[in-house]
Amino acid sequence: MSEMPKVRGRLTQARPLSDLTWLRVGGPADWLFQPADVEDLSDFLARLPEEVAVFPMGVGSNLIVRDGGLRCVVIRLGRGFNQIDISGTRVVAGAAALDAHVARKAADAGLDLTFLRTIPGSIGGAVRMNAGCYGSYTADVLVEVQVVSRTGEVTTLAARDLQLGYRHSTLAEGAVLTKAVFEAPRGDPETLHARMTDQLARRDATQPTKERSAGSTFRNPAGFSSTGRSDDVHDLKAWKVIDDAGMRGARRGGAQMSEMHSNFMVNTGRATAADLEGLGEEVRKKVYDSSGITLEWEIMRVGEKLSSD
């Protein structure tokens, strides 16, 4: 790979990534860059040879890095990008701010971003994937984002420019989202915190939160998140079609579809990325054979497989 530009942050060669993902799997990145701030990131990308690929990585909550690793520069934002500021009904959050922290701080100020409380990950990932639950989505409250392009240009994009859909945005490949601005509805702080406490209790009762998981494995075939309402039928939920295919609790190596929630894949202790991805593909095949439905991955899979996979 070409000679790397000088940086003020941290630039590490051949950095293993498994400890940076919630599933604790994956090979090394050629380089891992943790910029000090927006200027450091912009300058690095502007001087990085154009033939060098980059991969913006959040906190690794919805990600499988394959066992062969990534032949690129992985960019991971840290403390210089986790600020949360509130003015009136506007919440400005750095891309590295955790969704749960943003929800709690907004609630303290009497602002309702409670749907973010149980979403694993950081604001950058929430925007890029239009994360949502309980019938609310990031797109509902997003105003604009700050983005650093692959060529180092710092720009501001309106929410509409991202064309946010179900678990989808049109944010350019290699672009790094650094900050998001939300317009949040007002609410009573005590009521908002009580709602989040209830949401956490419901999540912990139905999802394997104490195991190594990456959140939902597949997108709902219905094309929307669970709302939690009594009229929200299950026929086109990913977990339901997985159950119908007999794949709840299915195993491959150290990977397992959770007994607690069949759309959650867990690392039982010694799974490889190949185990996890292979189990997911087996589930997809069984579901298709059972129902004719092709499940789409919600977990992102990146990198190279080992030759033995």
Swiss-Prot record:
UniProt KW keywords: Cell cycle, Cell division, Cell shape, Cell wall biogenesis/degradation, Cytoplasm, FAD, Flavoprotein, NADP, Oxidoreductase, Peptidoglycan synthesis
Pathway membership: Cell wall biogenesis; peptidoglycan biosynthesis
InterPro entries found in the cross-reference section: FAD-bd_PCMH (IPR016166), FAD-bd_PCMH-like_sf (IPR036318), FAD-bd_PCMH_sub1 (IPR016167), FAD-bd_PCMH_sub2 (IPR016169), MurB (IPR003170), MurB_C (IPR011601), MurB_C_sf (IPR036635), Oxid_FAD_bind_N (IPR006094)
Catalytic reactions on record: UDP-N-acetyl-alpha-D-muramate + NADP(+) = UDP-N-acetyl-3-O-(1-carboxyvinyl)-alpha-D-glucosamine + NADPH + H(+)
FAD-binding PCMH-type domain residues: 24-187
PROSITE patterns linked to this entry: FAD_PCMH
Pfam families per UniProt: FAD_binding_4 (PF01565), MurB_C (PF02873)
SUPFAM superfamilies per the UniProt record, alphabetical: FAD-binding/transporter-associated domain-like, Uridine diphospho-N-Acetylenolpyruvylglucosamine reductase, MurB, C-terminal domain
Active site: R167, S216, E298
Region feature Disordered, mapped onto this chain: 200-230
GO cellular component: cytosol
Biased composition (Basic and acidic residues): 200-213
Record's protein name: UDP-N-acetylenolpyruvoylglucosamine reductase
Group of enzyme by EC: oxidoreductase
UniProt cross-references to PANTHER family, sorted A to Z: UDP-N-ACETYLENOLPYRUVOYLGLUCOSAMINE REDUCTASE (PTHR21071:SF4)
MF terms in GO: FAD binding; UDP-N-acetylmuramate dehydrogenase activity
EC numbers on record: 1.3.1.98
Signal peptide: none
Source species: Roseobacter denitrificans (strain ATCC 33942 / OCh 114)
Cofactor: FAD
Compartment annotation: Cytoplasm
Principal location listed in the UniProt entry: cytoplasm
